[in-house]
Structures are given as C-alpha cells and as structure tokens.
Regions:
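Beta-strand-rich structural segments
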Residues: 222-226, 288, 625, 639-642, ...
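Short flexible loop/turn segments that cap and initiate beta-strands
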Residues: 46-48, 233-237, 278-284, 644, ...
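Short S/T/G/P-enriched beta-strand
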Residues: 310, 612, 618-638, 647, ...
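Extended carbohydrate-recognition surfaces in non-catalytic/accessory domains of CAZymes
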Residues: 21-124, 178, 184-187, 199, ...
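Extended substrate-binding grooves/exosites of carbohydrate-active enzymes
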Residues: 37, 61-67, 154, 190, ...
Length: 819
C-alpha cells in the first residue's frame, strides 16, 4: 500500500475530526474487549467478573468462527418473492453459521478531559448486530434494535466524575429467523468515543449542498447545527480546501442562533474539480466555531462538487453527461472475514469491481458501513443506499417488521444524515421487494418513507426495488416514486415505461445468474433452476433462477432503449447464505452462487463477460472452459470467448475451429463468441482476436494440465501498513511442471505465517466446503484458493508458507511498513 493510502486510511477512521486545539477528541474502542455468548444477569455492572471471557478486538463477528452446521437457523418458509407458495425446509439460508443467540461485550474507557471542566461525551456505534442495549457504569445508556444502522448516545451524565475507568457493556441478541442471508453477529463495526465542549457541532452536524454547479463555478451551502447554542452569538470561520490542501473559499459569519436553527454559510468555488467516477475530486470544509471570541469547536466535513439530474425520457445525468449505471448489488459480509468491517478488504473488493468497469454499488439491503461510503467517495463509485428488506409486513418471522412502525423514521433519519454529504451517494432506495408493495394502501407507506428522504435531503431522488410488476403498475405504488426501480422482470420493462409517468426504468436488481468458479456442466444449454448432485452450478453462465435471467438480456435492454437507466447486478460478490438454487434442504451449501466474483475474491468467468462490455479503457480476452477433460475425448465441449474485440478465431492443436463474430442471431451472440461443436482432445486451445480492421490484436492460450506438481503464491499486496489491521490477499494455485493450473485439484493446503504479521483467514469459493475460514488450512477448489495475512503493529516482513502433501511448497513475503 502506498503512503497516500495510509493517510487516507487514517482519515477514514474519523471523517469529521478536530484539527488541533484539543477541543474535540474522537477515538475508537478497538482493543481489550471481553466477549462471551450467552446471557448474564449482572453483566452490565462494573463489578461483574469477565476475566474468563474471550479477549477480542472490535470490529468482531462472533459467528464467523463457526462451525458450519445444517441445524443453525434452520427455517421452514415459503419465499414468496421467489414465487414459492409452499413452505419448505431452507438449509444454509443464513450461511449455516451460529449467529443466533445472545452475546455480551465489555470494555473500559477513559475521558480525562472531564477533570478540566464540563464536556459532552458521546458513544457512536457504526453497527451492532443486533437489538443493542448499551450500558455505562451499570446504567442503560441507549437501545437500538436495527443491527445495520449507526446510532449514538450521550453518556456524559453516566461517566465517573474524574472521567476514568468507565465500564462499557453491550448486550446483543439475534433471534432465529431474523434474516434471509448471513447477517453476522456482534460489534462487527467500529465503536467511537467523541469528546467535545458543551457547545459543539453534534454527530452529523453539517449538511453540505451544491445548489449550482458548472465547469467555471460552483455554489456551496453549508448548514452547521450546534448543540447548547440557543441565544448565543456565534461566529464561524470556515475554509474550504481542495484535495491538495489549498484554500479555495473562505467565509467568516456571525449570527445569533435560536430554536435549534442551523448556522448557514454560502460559498463560491471557481473552476471547481467536479466529482465523478472518472475524477473523484474531494473537498474539505474546516469550520472553527467561536462564542465571545473563544474557540469552542472545530469540525471537518468532506464533500464533493457534482450535479445529478434524472430527466424523463432521457435518463441519468452526472455533471451534464448522460450515463447508464454499470452497477452491482453487494451484501455486507466480507466472505471469510464475516461481517467484521475491514478497510483493506473493502478496498480490495472495490478495486476488483472497478477493473471490471463497475461504476456503482447498491447496498443491498441495508445501511452500509461508513468506511464503504468513504471509499466510494475516494475511488469514484456511485452509490444507491438502501435501508430495508422489509417494512411492516414480514418476510422473516423475527425480521425488521417488528420495529418498523416505531423505528423506521429514526432509522431513515440516521441513515440520511450520516451519508447526505457523500458525493458518491446519488440516490436513496427505501426498500427491496417488500410485501407491502401489493397492498392497496402500500403506496402510503412508500410515500411516508419517500417524504422522509425529501425532507431530510431534497437533493437526491428516491427509488425502491419492486418485483411485483402487475401490483405496482395498478395500485399507484410505482407511479409515486421518483425513480421506478424493478428487480428482474426484464420482459415487463417496456410495459412499465409506457404506463408510468416518470418515463424511466432502472434495473435496481438484475440477472441473478448462478455459477461456481471453474465448474462446467454438459450439455451446455440455457436452464432455469438447474441443480446437480454436487450442489454446484455451471460456469458457462447459462443458468439462472426461475425468477431471473442471464446477463445478456440486461445488456441488450440498456443498449436498445434510451429510457433504461442501467442496472445493478445481483451480485458483485458471492456472499454467505441464500445458496440458490440449493436453498431447499440441500446441505452442504452455505453461500450464494450469484456473484460475479466468488467468496474467495477470485473472479469467475462471468467477470470477463461484464468486463468486455463495461471496461472501455482496456482490452478483454477471456476463454472458457479449462482444457483438462480426460473423460471427454471426442465429445462436444463448447468454447466461449468473452471479449471486446468484434471477432476471433479458435484453434485446437493448431487446427482452426472457425471464426466467430458478434451478431444479432441471438442475445447471447451479441455479447459472446461461441464455438458449440468443438470436439475435445487434449493439447493447446488458442484464440486469436481481431480488431475492427481485421488485424490480429491479441491472443490467449489454454493448455491441458499434467499432474499436479507444485503450489504457487501471488499477491497484489506487496506492501501493507503496520497497523495491526491491514490485510494482504494471496492467491494460491496448483500447477503442473509447465506452470499450467490444475483445474480439478482439491488438495488440502496448510499455512504457516512468521514475522511481522499473522494468519487471518482463507477461502476457496466452494459453496459446499465446510472448512472453517479462520483455521490455517483450506482445501483448494478448482485448483485455487485465497489466503489472507494481517499485519501486526511492528514494521517488518510477513512470511507466508503454503504446504500440501505430494506438492512442492511455496513461500511469499509481504512487507509491513510503518505509518
């Protein structure tokens, strides 16, 4: 990781922080936590003995350590949004991991500033799964039921008068049948302590908008809220700095505040650097707050200057330029790390998606970690932020519907205030496939939520992921949304466009093609709900669920109709839980197959299909399947090529198999080059791609693999920060003596880590594998897996060694660099 990344990492920990003066201090509670599953009557009390509890660091997901088991959260339900009418046993729906139950966390913290006079102290939880009850020094400080939202509570009056040795205890409870996917468990996001003067800018206390934006000028409006400021004459001095730290605008204003009104300042930035995926420029507003010439607070807000418009019959415009979303939906887990947030893991995921050409993320179906939103700001990924998978009608027996009536507005307000200054966020979604959409008065609930968005942030439009097209077209639900968003149902898009007043259609959730990396099934044909005895799906990318479709259909819609706004594919990454099409009593199967990238962060073949359409800057030439089929000699073994070149020629052992060109013969022929009648014989398979002028542009070769010979290790993370958190992802492969990957190899690999780091986890992308991620061993899947090492806080070198019986071992070194 470069030094600039280290600086950005530090900024991510506290995007709104004090710069000097010691007036505001924010720190994380990461180390020295004690944890135990189970309920303890006296655990909130300071005198409670937790010495025998497990010592953990936060963020922490208690369930990811397993074990996998069919019985964990076994559900018998009918998934109505998938068209099911009869309840069936669902195994692995929430990942087969032990997230259900009660857990307690305990720690202590000091606030020595209390000795110097009156202060205010706030605890902020970025996410706690779930039904969090927070206790400080034996007294309940707050309760927040929704595990995905950020919440905060004022604990000033609960602290010891000297500010020292304050006991914090958090009780969490996950009920069975409370989720449709793996939610994680515990304090899986960061916990902050914020210390300020009595009069201060509160959490999320600024609101930045850009009412006018052009290439030559941008107006910036900053509303600053202040607590305990009524009746006081306030002076605020604000500098706006560009990404180089240069002051580009300055204002000093004074006014008397009453009735909780915000302090308003207006600025002009000349020749602004506009935020976009191609150029994610960011600014900082640094505000100093004075009362009677005394500096009482200093607050920093990061924002971007950009203009968004959604125009009927035209589409989405960013900074005046029409574009269609090339987005993906992602659940919140980080594969083998579980739900515990990690910035370097998030960055690795996002960079893989960006190389594919992805430019947008939908946070399905919950509020995201703040680190994800900050990274999208920096890297240039647009976002649709979505809070709910259900409203007041249940999808899950113990889901959010239990809290909706009382808590929905509070959850929405927290979410919007948290992320309304982030330029990456271009729209809000108020829900996903909610059963309420088909109720006659369902539009009233949608209107209630949409109006909260409009009230708290009138600068962004609102959508909702709708899947019951007939209902929402007839009952007014779809017509009252700012942007009608549809999940699948591609054959109904044109009908929706013709009937709805918005004259726009957004693919809020698309495709749901299923595949297992490196697994190929014969014969090759388009199939819905295809299942096999090995619980895998074919990587020919021709299989989907009964309610979904193949990627080519969505590509064609986006290209052929000006009123389509693009798509958010289900999903960018495989995730824990929801193992369709094997979710009905088909154990073992603990993770999804929808991902373009597998659970080990290894791209599937489908990755290159999207890349060939979405990545306009670089060439793509990818061939499948592998070419090691000892049992298929003489049998038809189709070959697919995913490329952004218009035509290519295939050779098997030097003999041409013909030239294929993209055509309108079928929707698949528009986007794939396919040789359906290749007769397998071992040897060399080569594809030569030609450019539009007919010149040879690029070639790719796959060879039949010999016997497995050795392990190989490779990483893109040659250097990482020595911060005790950063990760290096290491790809592990088995190759023959000539270096060809052995695509069927599934040996057990053992890992050993020495030096300035530790073993963190491994994954192989096999949804049926029950190896535990945290143990230093993992079976290969389709000849590959990913191992992850973590830095310590001491600079040096991390040595990872991989061994497997009968194979030559391999070593790799990662440098851990001081901050």
């Amino acid at each position: 990781m470069k030094k600039i990344d280290i600086i950005l990492f530090c900024l991510l920990l506290a995007p709104c922080i004090l710069m000097g003066q010691g007036l505001r201090r924010e720190f994380l509670l990461e180390k020295n936590w004690r944890f135990s599953k189970g309920d303890f009557e006296q655990a909130a009390n300071a005198a409670f003995d937790d010495s025998k509890w497990q010592q953990v660091a936060v963020p922490h997901d208690w369930a990811i350590y397993g074990p996998f088991d069919r019985s964990h959260d076994l559900q018998q339900v009918a998934v109505t949004q998938n068209g099911e009418k009869v309840a069936t046993v669902k195994t692995g729906r929430t990942g087969g991991l032990p997230y259900v139950g009660i857990g307690w966390y305990r720690s202590t913290f000091d606030v020595p500033e209390l000795k110097d006079g009156k202060k205010q102290v706030v605890l902020k939880f970025d996410g706690a799964m779930s039904e969090a009850r927070v206790y400080v020094n034996g007294q309940e400080a707050c309760f927040w039921p929704f595990g995905y939202n950020t919440f905060h509570c004022d604990v000033t009056n609960l602290l010891h008068t000297d500010g020292m040795d304050n006991q914090l205890a958090v009780r969490l409870e996950n009920k069975p049948q409370s989720s449709r996917w793996y939610p994680g468990a515990g304090l899986y996001r960061n916990v902050h302590v914020i210390v300020t003067e009595e009069m201060h800018v509160p959490v999320w206390g600024t609101y930045v908008t850009t009412p006018f934006v052009s290439d030559s000028s941008a107006s910036v409006r900053i509303e600053t809220n202040l607590e305990n400021a009524d009746g006081k004459a306030i002076r605020i001095l604000t500098d706006i700095l560009d990404s180089d730290g240069k002051v580009v605008a300055h204002k000093e204003n004074q006014q008397k505040l009453n009735y909780g009104n915000p302090f308003v300042q207006n600025f002009e930035i000349r020749n602004p650097s506009l935020w976009s995926p191609e150029s994610p420029s960011l600014y900082r507003a640094v505000s100093k707050i004075y009362v009677d010439d005394k500096l009482v607070d200093q607050y920093q807000t990061r924002f971007g200057v950009r203009d968004i418009k959604f125009i009927a019959d035209k589409g989405f415009f960013l900074n005046g330029k029409l574009r269609k979303f090339q987005g993906v939906c992602n659940h919140h887990d980080l594969g083998p790390l579980g739900a515990a947030i990690n910035i370097s893991a998030l960055r690795y995921q996002l960079e893989l998606l960006m190389d594919m050409g992805c430019d947008a993320i939908r946070t399905a179906h919950n509020m995201p970690a703040p680190e994800l939103v900050e990274l999208c700001d920096e890297l240039g990924l647009m976002m649709m932020i979505e809070p709910f998978d259900e409203w007041n009608i249940a999808k899950c027996k113990n889901g959010y519907h239990r809290f909706f009536d009382e808590w929905a507005e509070r959850d929405m307000v927290n979410m919007i205030h948290h992320f309304r200054n982030n330029p990456s966020v271009v729209m809000w979604s108020i829900g996903n496939e909610v059963p309420t959409q088909c109720r006659p008065d369902g539009y009233k609930v949608a209107s209630f939520l949409q109006e909260i968005c409009h009230r708290e942030d009138p600068t962004r439009p609102v959508t909702c992921g709708m899947d019951q097209v007939s209902c929402v077209l007839e009952n007014g639900f779809a017509s009252m949304l700012d942007i009608p968003g549809f999940n699948y149902r591609v054959h109904r898009y044109e009908e929706a466009y013709n009937k709805l007043p918005q004259n726009l259609v957004l693919g809020t959730e698309t495709s749901s093609t299923v595949s297992s990396r490196g697994v190929y099934k014969f014969p090759v044909e388009k199939r819905g709900d295809a299942t096999y005895s090995d619980h895998q799906s074919s990587s020919y990318d021709m299989e989907h669920c009964s309610w979904s479709n193949l990627p080519d259909d969505d590509f064609a819609l986006a290209e052929d109709h000006h009123w389509t706004m693009g798509q958010f594919v289900w999903t960018g990454f495989d995730y824990l839980g929801e193992p369709s099409p094997y979710d009905t009593d088909a154990w073992p199967n603990h993770s999804s197959m929808f991902g373009i990238i597998d659970l080990a962060s290894i791209p599937k073949d489908r990755y290159y299909l999207y890349r060939s359409l979405w990545n306009k800057k670089e060439s793509t030439l990818h061939m499948l399947p592998h070419w090691t089929w000892p049992d298929r000699v003489g049998e038809k073994t189709p070959v697919f090529v995913y490329t952004n070149y218009p035509r290519a020629e295939l050779f098997l052992n030097g003999k041409s198999q013909g030239i294929q060109e993209k055509s309108n013969q079928s929707v698949q022929h528009r986007y794939r080059l396919m040789w359906m009648d290749v007769l397998y014989e071992p040897g060399e398979l080569k594809v030569i791609a030609y450019d539009t002028a007919g010149n040879i542009a690029e070639e790719k070769i796959i060879r039949t693999a010999g016997k497995p010979y050795k392990l190989e290790l490779e990483t893109n993370h040659g250097t990482i920060p020595a911060d005790g958190k950063s990760l290096a992802y290491v790809r592990v492969k088995v190759v023959d003596k000539e270096g060809n990957i052995c695509p069927d190899e599934g040996s057990l690999v053992h890992f050993d880590v020495k030096g300035a780091g530790s073993y963190r986890a491994a994954a192989n992308g096999d949804p049926t594998c029950l190896d535990m991620f945290h143990l230093p061993q993992m079976h290969l899947f389709s000849g590959q897996l990913t191992a992850i090492v973590q830095s310590s806080e001491q600079p040096g070198y991390i040595l990872l060694e991989a061994k497997s019986k009968g194979l030559k071992s391999a070593k790799i070194t990662v440098k851990s660099e001081g901050l």
